[in-house]
Amino acid sequence: MRLKLLWVGKTQESWVRTGIEEYAGRIRRYAPLEILEAREEKGAQAAAMRERECERLAKLIPKGGRLVLLDERGEAMTSPELASFLSKNRDQGTQDLVFAIGGAYGFTDAFRSQAFKSISLSRMTLTHQMVRVFLLEQIYRGFTIINGEPYHHE
């Protein structure tokens, strides 16, 4: 199973980039990982920005890819539940598991309708920059749980 992370806009803060690089490297010990950035839309009305950004994200999804949205309206999962989700997708032969983080205005309804699943990392509002690191850490944590490694503690 290949993992793809899609997000809108460049990573601004160097410390966020450092976190991304750290956890991406750890994840790659378990599965191929590709991170792709869609260009952020600027200077338009919120609905138009959301539409254009979702169009750009959609072009990055490989054919047959299983899309998982990171969305405040998504399902809350524990780390072991995410581990189980990763394991089931791997075992069922999912070729590309694609996680998408939207821009400041989120996703269009049309883009949401393409998703296999929608998950939320927190009921709190998080910056789109920090969600990148949090998601990568949780995916890494999931793989350590799957492999019975001493990273996650209950």
UniProtKB/Swiss-Prot annotation:
Keywords attached to this entry: Cytoplasm, Methyltransferase, rRNA processing, S-adenosyl-L-methionine, Transferase
Q: What is its EC number?
A: 2.1.1.177
- Mind telling me which InterPro entries this protein's record contains? Alpha/beta_knot_MTases, RlmH-like, tRNA_m1G_MTases_N
Q: Name one GO cellular component term.
A: cytoplasm
Name its cellular compartments.
Answer: Cytoplasm
- What top-level branch of life does the organism fall under? Bacteria
Q: Which reaction does it catalyse?
A: pseudouridine(1915) in 23S rRNA + S-adenosyl-L-methionine = N(3)-methylpseudouridine(1915) in 23S rRNA + S-adenosyl-L-homocysteine + H(+)
Instruction: Supply one GO molecular-function term.
Output: rRNA (pseudouridine-N3-)-methyltransferase activity
Tell me which residues bind S-adenosyl-L-methionine.
L70, G102, L121, S122, R123, M124, T125, L126
Q: Name one Pfam family in it.
A: SPOUT_MTase
What do we know about how this protein assembles, alone or with others? Homodimer.
* Function according to Swiss-Prot or TrEMBL: Specifically methylates the pseudouridine at position 1915 (m3Psi1915) in 23S rRNA.
Cross-referenced PANTHER family, in alphabetical order?
Answer: METHYLTRANSFERASE (PTHR33603), RIBOSOMAL RNA LARGE SUBUNIT METHYLTRANSFERASE H (PTHR33603:SF1)
Q: Which family does it belong to?
A: Belongs to the RNA methyltransferase RlmH family.
What name is this protein filed under? Ribosomal RNA large subunit methyltransferase H
Organism of origin is Geobacter sp. (strain M21)
Gene that specifies this protein: rlmH
